[in-house]
Amino acid sequence: MTLLDLDPDQLLSTTRAVRKRLDFARPVPGPLIRDCVAMALQAPSGSNVVTMRFVVVQDAEKRRAIGEIYSEIYARYKASGSYPSRPTGDPERDRVQQRVASSADYLGAHIGEAPVLVLGCNEGSDRASALAGLGNILPAMWSFMLAARARGLGTAWTSMHRSREQEVADILGIPYDTVAQAVLTPVAYTKGTDFRPAARPDPDVVIHWDGW
């Protein structure tokens, strides 16, 4: 597999949440997902203990069932006060947020159509330890997404399915008492690979040197 010609800074700054540009019609080979997981496992983990787990969902019926749950949760989110298209009073910011909202709406309606869904999880000895160790899977999932981008795949970090985590666990046979789900992402080839850095604040706005 040929990797995209991206230097480290380009990879880090152009790995975006991809929604409307996911190619749902193109299958993603299992070995390619495995390669991304191999890279993800190089991420840091507490005490060098590998408790992160990746549930790769290729089965169409399971993807559809998870997609229905996600869509129902998203519909409630859209009706809430945290929906990203709420006016802010800043015209430029509002335009950006409208684009984000439109993109999120699309994923809310179509996530189950992605050729692959991946759930990043953490395994513990019981529910409490599984939740306490979620810090292991979070950097690993970001590494997974960087590896996917380098291979021409798109992802979108989501977690709202966790409000119905038990139902998703039941669909996939995930042992709820010992495995905590952290992240759900679609995985698909992207329509084009020309992604750009997002608008972000100047670093000096968010840096506090030697204290707050």
Give the role of each language-model region.
Residues 75-87, 172-197:
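A glycine-rich helix N-cap at a beta->alpha junction
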Residues 56-137:
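Glycine/small-residue-rich phosphate/adenosyl-binding loop
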Residues 43-49:
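Glycine-rich phosphate/pyrophosphate-binding beta-alpha loops
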Residues 39-42, 102-105, 168-171, 191-194:
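Glycine-rich, charged/polar anion/phosphate-binding loops
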Residues 38-40, 116-171:
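Small-aliphatic-rich amphipathic alpha-helix that forms the alpha element of a beta-alpha
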Residues 1-27, 31-35, 39:
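N-terminal targeting/leader regions
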